[in-house]
């Protein structure tokens, strides 16, 4: 919600594309990782986040729209890299909100893994669709706090380990 409010205000801010980078500048060295969770759009907050980022972990929903949106994101990232942030890289692709029913999600997952193998890292960890994630968000807490012993929480912990181990 906070990012949505910021998105409405960013165009009015002088130098809006560098505003997040400027904001994070003084605190960047205090953290190993700073996560900026953007909405699935290519609006001004997402672009400003790309300008501020060192690398991007890209969640991909294994369905047509999720796959189709990747090309637009990669094109936007290429423009940001050329003009505003030469060091921007892809940390990896994360298959997320994976449905356990039907063959289509598994087929899309295979497509994603095959299409980007050798191009970008596709994390081994897959995050399954779970009601606990939106419920945790609605309660303003992490999924770890909200649903400590649930499968989806264990998947997020596995992703964390995978990111930390592979840097």
Show where each model-derived region lies.
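C-terminal boundary of histidine-terminating zinc-finger modules
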Residues: 136-155
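Conserved catalytic-core segment of NTP-binding enzymes
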Residues: 23, 28-128
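P-loop/Walker-type NTP enzyme "switch/lid" segment
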Residues: 1-29, 84, 136-138
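Short, glycine-rich, amphipathic interfacial segments at transmembrane boundaries or analogous
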Residues: 129-136
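Charged catalytic carboxylate motif
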Residues: 19, 72, 155
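Short, polar/flexible loop-turn hinges at active-site or ligand-entry regions and domain interfaces
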Residues: 7-10, 60, 145-147
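C-terminal alpha-helix
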Residues: 158-167
């Amino acid at each position: 919600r906070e990012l949505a409010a910021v998105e409405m205000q960013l165009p009015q801010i002088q130098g809006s594309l560098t505003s997040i980078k400027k904001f994070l500048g003084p605190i960047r060295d205090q953290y190993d990782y700073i996560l900026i969770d953007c909405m699935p759009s290519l609006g001004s907050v997402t672009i400003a986040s790309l300008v501020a980022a060192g690398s991007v972990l890209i969640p991909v929903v294994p369905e047509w729209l999720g796959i189709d949106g990747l090309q637009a994101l990669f094109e936007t990232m290429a423009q940001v890299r050329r003009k505003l942030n030469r060091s921007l890289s892809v940390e990896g692709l994360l298959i997320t909100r994976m449905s356990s029913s039907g063959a289509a999600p598994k087929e899309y997952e295979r497509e994603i893994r095959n299409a980007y193998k050798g191009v970008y890292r596709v994390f081994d960890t897959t995050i399954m669709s779970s009601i606990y994630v939106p419920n945790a968000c609605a309660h303003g807490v992490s999924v770890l706090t909200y649903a400590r012993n649930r499968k989806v929480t264990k998947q997020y912990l596995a992703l964390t380990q995978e990111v930390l181990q592979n840097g």
